[in-house]
Amino acid sequence: MNKQIHFTVIIPCFNAEATVQAAIDSVISQTYSHKDLIIVDGKSTDGTLAILKANEANISLIISEKDKGVYDAINKGIKAAEGNIIYVLGADDKLASDEILEHVALHFTPEISLVFGHIRNVHIQNKAVPEVHSSSFSNLLYLKNTLHQQGCFYRTSLFEKELFNPEYKIFGDYDLHLKWFIGKINTYKLDQTISICEAAGLSKQVKWDLYKEEIRMKKARLSTLLFLLNCVWVPLKFIRKKIFA
């Protein structure tokens, strides 16, 4: 066990009474002991808070207040984190096995800033969504987000200068992934499934407003040439998903 690695797992949630217990259980059951759990609730109106209260003994911090969206909630968790590694788990997702944190910790050598693996989608309604999302940290990031946040473990130090942009609805993680790729951070790919994820989320919706957000994000991050390429590529992605959805 790498005792120098301490994980802070952040679960952002809102009205997640049907799924949040499974997410919590998947963290509690991890065999790796150097971890803490922060749950950031957006002032839920269902039974979520009662579930969180019942799990207080296993939760380091519960924040329950209105937020500006999921990235605002995640940022609150990062600011409160005590661990040197950040992991974000969706309230309707769960870690794929009890040994995930143990496996990840083995590969966080001092020069590594990001360890990533694959995720598995469930409840797929859109055939364009792959069952297994295979991750990569490569030039493909210029065209699409080839890293899934629920498959990524970040050094807390990555967020010292910049947190997730809370103005983005779904591209806050892609935004920073691009920044870090351009900045050439050191990463390690773990060839295993990290989490099991609900595939029917916001990022799987085929709405032009979401694609416009991707274009806006890339305008701020990319060179002029790469941005112009994406001005063609992103609409083509939208049309393809509209046709095959």
Go through each PLM region and give its residues.
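Short aromatic/hydrophobic "clamp" motif used to bind/position activated sugar donors
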Residues: 86
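Conserved donor NDP-sugar-binding/catalytic core segment of glycosyltransferases
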Residues: 94, 98-129
